[in-house]
Amino acid sequence: MRTMILTALLVTALATPALAQSYPVSGRWGESNSSEKGPIDCSGNRRIIYFLGDQRTDSNGGVPEYRNKSVQSVGQSDYRIVDEFNNGQVSNGQSEYTLRKIDSNHIVMNQSGTALNLQRCK
């Protein structure tokens, strides 16, 4: 009986998909170099990054949707993030970047030395 229970637990653990981690931020963030406090108006042609649970969408770029694979804290407000994506040309691609929380309304995504300054949307 004990062997059956252990076997059932092992099979269940192996059959359960790995759960992706959530991003360290959530909501809609617009591209902005402004230092103004508070959320900004994100209407118009502004680039929008939307973090929702373990998914991220980007209104500008070749890959519209990403799924988070891992989040590693590398400091008090810095994170190393790995996302997965699929599009017409790439299957199971990965995107690696760092995310820095400046304050509750400002973050910076840095991928391959290119910084994208974002501010929370209203």
Annotate each PLM feature:
Residues N60-N68:
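A short, amphipathic edge element
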Residues S26-R28, L52-R56, G75-V82, S104-I107:
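Short, hydrophobic/aromatic-rich segments at coil-to-beta transitions
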Residues I5-A15:
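Hydrophobic helical h-region of N-terminal Sec-dependent signal peptides
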Residues R46-I49, R67-Q72, Q94-K101:
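Hydrophobic/aromatic beta-strand elements that line small-molecule binding cavities or substrate pockets
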